[in-house]
């Protein structure tokens, strides 16, 4: 269990670093958020396996479903944003059109 929790902690720290160090590219931000959800899933699996309860493993499937929907919606918004503004730089797309 310790190895899985360590893996989850390392993945979470990498994703947190990706969010804080790269605030310009929306694609990297989406990937970091997905990696953060993956690290939480690894921890759910580790605790579910240790306690012998399948509820944590079942909960992972729901999280993966929500994460897939989030990624699809995020990429659709990103494509629309690129078509209208010709950039995906966060600093340039933070204003609303009036």
UniProtKB/Swiss-Prot annotation:
Catalytic activity, EC: 7.1.1.-
Record field: transmembrane: 1-21, 27-47, 59-79
A Pfam family annotated for this UniProt entry: Oxidored_q2
Top-rank taxon: Bacteria
Molecular functions (GO terms): NADH:ubiquinone reductase (non-electrogenic) activity; quinone binding
One Gene Ontology biological process: ATP synthesis coupled electron transport
Annotated keywords: Cell inner membrane, Cell membrane, Membrane, NAD, Quinone, Translocase, Transmembrane, Transmembrane helix, Transport, Ubiquinone
Membrane topology label: Multi-pass membrane protein
Localization, UniProt: Cell inner membrane
Primary enzyme class: translocase
Role this protein plays: NDH-1 shuttles electrons from NADH, via FMN and iron-sulfur (Fe-S) centers, to quinones in the respiratory chain. The immediate electron acceptor for the enzyme in this species is believed to be ubiquinone. Couples the redox reaction to proton translocation (for every two electrons transferred, four hydrogen ions are translocated across the cytoplasmic membrane), and thus conserves the redox energy in a proton gradient.
Sequence similarity: Belongs to the complex I subunit 4L family.
Protein name: NADH-quinone oxidoreductase subunit K
Species of origin: Xanthomonas oryzae pv. oryzae (strain PXO99A)
Annotated gene: nuoK
């Amino acid at each position: 269990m310790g190895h899985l929790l360590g893996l989850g902690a390392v993945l979470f720290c990498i994703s947190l670093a990706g969010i804080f160090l790269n605030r310009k590219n929306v694609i990297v931000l989406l990937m970091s958020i997905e990696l953060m959800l993956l690290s939480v899933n690894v921890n759910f699996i580790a605790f579910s396996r240790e306690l012998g309860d399948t509820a944590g493993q079942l909960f992972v499937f729901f999280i993966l479903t929500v994460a897939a929907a989030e990624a699809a919606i995020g990429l659709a918004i990103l494509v629309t944003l690129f078509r209208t503004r010709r950039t995906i730089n966060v600093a340039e797309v933070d204003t609303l059109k009036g």
